[in-house]
Amino acid sequence: MTIGVVGRKCGMTRIFTEEGVSIPVTVIEIEPNRVTQFKTEETDGYRAVQVTVGERRASRVTAAQAGHFAKANVAAGRGVWEFRLEEGEYQAGDLINAEIFAAGQLVDVTGQSKGKGFAGTIKRWNFRGQDNTHGNSVSHRVPGSIGQCQTPGRVFKGKKMSGHMGAERVTVQSLEVVRVDAERNLLLVKGAVPGATGGNLVVRPAAKARG
């Protein structure tokens, strides 16, 4: 896989082309990603680069984490992320920023979707509601039957039912990079990306890029 970067969702806006076409974009702040470890096949069995981003108070860093960051001689960040590599070399302390992307490139953006709490089947799985009238009472938003009788005598795994919705890992694929602002460490991506404003995002070159 090709290396990506970790960023923070700033929100959405729009920009205009020279022809006056409005393009909705998500603004992603790409703070410099600090390399904390470079893994090789000889030492770890695979090639990867491990990065951290942002800052974290010393009181919020465990002793094990503090030792790991100190060994790499980098400041403690708000998390640790890893990218598999097929080629390229990095050293602890190297910086990776938004300049690895270019305008017009397609990227995959991964984040944690907004949590919706406990949701019914209509909101969670787009079930249709039952009749409002015609003899129906107190069953307008219920899912209906969830299985058969004695055979098989159980509810199949994976049955779509009510439950916790959102707050899960989501990847949106093949979004176009509209603009790269290297001075302000900003990446403008066409369309919406998962998660709330301020959430962590992982931006990688598109795995299924067309052409």
Swiss-Prot record:
N5-methylglutamine PTM positions: 150
Q: Name one Pfam family in it.
A: Ribosomal_L3
The protein's PTM annotation reads:
Methylated by PrmB.
Q: Does the keyword rRNA-binding apply?
A: yes
**Key words of the record:** Methylation, Ribonucleoprotein, Ribosomal protein, RNA-binding, rRNA-binding
Supply one GO CC term from the record. Answer: cytosolic large ribosomal subunit
**What are the GO MF terms of this UniProt record?**
rRNA binding; structural constituent of ribosome
Q: List the disulfide bonds.
A: none
InterPro entries from the xrefs?
Answer: Ribosomal_uL3, Ribosomal_uL3_bac/org-type, Ribosomal_uL3_CS, Transl_B-barrel_sf
Its BP terms in the Gene Ontology are: translation
Query: Subunit arrangement?
Result: Part of the 50S ribosomal subunit. Forms a cluster with proteins L14 and L19.
> Which NCBIfam families does this one have?
L3_bact
Q: What does this protein do?
A: One of the primary rRNA binding proteins, it binds directly near the 3'-end of the 23S rRNA, where it nucleates assembly of the 50S subunit.
Q: Which family does it belong to?
A: Belongs to the universal ribosomal protein uL3 family.
- The name on file for this protein is Large ribosomal subunit protein uL3
